[in-house]
From Swiss-Prot:
Origin superkingdom: Eukaryota
Protein localization: Cell membrane; Cytoplasmic vesicle membrane
Organism lineage string: Eukaryota, Metazoa, Chordata, Craniata, Vertebrata
Protein's name according to its UniProt entry: Small cell adhesion glycoprotein
InterPro entries assigned: SMAGP (IPR043243)
Keywords noted in UniProt: Cell membrane, Cytoplasmic vesicle, Glycoprotein, Membrane, Sialic acid, Transmembrane, Transmembrane helix
Mod. after translation: O-glycosylated. The O-glycan is modified with sialic acid residues.
Membrane-spanning parts: 37-57
Function: May play a role in epithelial cell-cell contacts. May play a role in tumor invasiveness and metastasis formation.
PANTHER family: SMALL CELL ADHESION GLYCOPROTEIN (PTHR47394:SF1)
Cytoplasmic side: 58-97
CC terms in the record's Gene Ontology section: cytoplasmic vesicle membrane; plasma membrane
UniProt topology in membrane: Single-pass type III membrane protein
Length: 97
């Protein structure tokens, strides 16, 4: 019967856990938690840095790389080729349903 927990005093029962005195941690546990927090912050920072770097390189490589499929200036053969292709397509059109 000696291993029963002690009954807390009425003052301890009246206070909320927020207002109770925090338990002190051992120095080793405090160092471990500090190291863990530092590692998490470092990983988050490196992840954000790598994402920003990838976005920068993507935007730099794709700068102005859109294709309009318009013929270049002074290429009449390209214009004629486009007109003949559209004429061939109007001769016989089949629709599969």
């Amino acid at each position: 019967m000696n291993n029963l927990p002690a009954t807390p005093s009425p003052e301890e029962l009246m206070t909320t856990p927020v207002f109770q005195a925090p338990e002190t941690m051992s120095p080793q546990a405090e160092e471990a938690s500090t190291a863990l927090i530092a590692v998490v912050i470092t990983v988050v920072f490196l992840t954000l840095l790598s994402v920003v770097t990838l976005i920068f390189f993507y935007l730099y490589k794709n700068k102005g790389s859109y294709v309009t499929y318009e013929p270049a200036e002074g290429e009449p053969s390209a214009i004629l080729q486009m007109e003949t292709d559209s004429a061939k397509g109007k001769e016989k059109e089949e629709y599969f349903i």
